[in-house]
Amino acid sequence: MANQLRERHQSLKKKYRELIDGDPSLPPEKRKQANLAQLLRDSQDRNKHLGEEIKELQQRLGEVQGDNKLLRMTIAKQRLGDEEIGVRHFAAHEREDLVQQLERAKEQIESLEHDLQASVDELQDVKEERSSYQDKVERLNQELNHILSGHENRIIDVDALCMENRYLQERLKQLHEEVNLLKSNIAKYKNALERRKNSKGQNKSSSSALTGVLSAKQVQDLLSEDHGCSLPATPQSISDLKSLATALLETIHEKNMVIQHQRQTNKILGNRVAELEKKLRTLEVSGLWSLPGLSYNVSIGFGSMFFLKYLCLWLIAVH
């Protein structure tokens, strides 16, 4: 190899000397011009030849790249065709991307597994806490039944007692409102009696009209045709009519208050019925409730029977 390079160097050196020296028959100036012209032509020819070679090489490179791509596709198709689940042929950079994606997926899977384990542990803690609360409720029911000297087979439910307590509180509030209404009516009747005692020298009908407390019969008598036609347009009659209108307005207001209290009572009773139905459904689902004629072990409170009796009596009175 070294001998070949040495021979190549000697030949190039000799050729370079010949080009520099040129034709010995020409004068030195002409010889230099001829040498330069020859060098220029040779350089142009060489450049042209090299340009053609570059084009040819570029064309061959494109063909080789196309053949390489086609060959890779053919190999991949053959691999996929030979196996049922073939392994795809990936390039180096694609394999790196896939490895990175696989690592990220593994990290996500590990994170999800950790979260799942934490959720399972939390669920187990909640179940244990629920069991402890259930045991506590059972113990409270037994203690409450023992305090109330109840029967062992009829344990009083705490939820039923709480529901009974809410119902009684609402009823107590309703009764307070009714007591206040009755007190206002009593005060009005007292004022009417005082005015009646003080109004002397007037007839019975006019005094009744001025009291502000009228019965249905008194109103019908005052508004009858005989009294209406024979009623003179005097200040006394106008005052009686004003008193009658005031009494009617007060009576209407009282009736409205009674209706409102009745609606509130109906709402309380409706809520009570809904709570009892919910309690019965809960007992039915838990297996503690049975068909009529059979007994169940959990009591819903002694106040419930009183409430049912009261509800039946109220429905009979309404209808």
UniProtKB/Swiss-Prot annotation:
Entry keyword set: Coiled coil, Membrane, Transmembrane, Transmembrane helix
Organism: Bos taurus (Bovine)
Gene: CCDC149
Family indicated by similarity: Belongs to the CCDC149 family.
GO CC terms: membrane
Signal peptide: none
Keyword Membrane carried by entry: yes
Subcellular location: Membrane
Keyword Transmembrane helix recorded: yes
Main location class: membrane
Coiled-coil segments on the chain, per record: 1-199, 259-286
Residues annotated as transmembrane: 298-318
Membrane topology value: Single-pass membrane protein
Pfam families referenced in this protein's UniProt entry, alphabetically: CC149 (PF09789)
Protein name per Swiss-Prot or TrEMBL: Coiled-coil domain-containing protein 149
Domain of life of the organism encoding this protein: Eukaryota
